[in-house]
């Protein structure tokens, strides 16, 4: 059975920023953290026998989510810029 997740939001953010090697903007963090926590909760519900779904796993999962969200923001902004340029 997986251990209880005990890491606070501030601790998680500090560890994710350390893992990524850079500061995370608030707007990006506010979307990424809840998504990663929800994703881990779903994994834990589906596979309760897995014992490595712990705080460290949440750090890695959240770091991936931050990267994915930032990339999504970038591609959406690029698409909007291309579409705006085409309409002129």
Language-model region placement:
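Ampiphathic alpha-helical segments that act as solvent-exposed interaction surfaces
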Residues: 70-88
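N-terminal segment of the canonical double-stranded RNA-binding domain
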Residues: 2-71, 75
């Amino acid at each position: 059975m997986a251990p209880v997740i005990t890491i606070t939001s501030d601790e998680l953010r500090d560890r994710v920023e350390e893992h990524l090697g850079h500061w995370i903007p608030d707007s990006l963090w506010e979307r990424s953290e809840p998504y990663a926590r929800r994703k881990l909760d779903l994994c834990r519900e589906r596979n309760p026998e897995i014992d490595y779904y712990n705080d460290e796993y949440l750090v890695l999962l959240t770091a991936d989510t931050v990267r994915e969200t930032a990339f999504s923001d970038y591609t959406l902004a690029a698409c909007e810029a291309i579409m705006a340029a085409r309409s002129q």
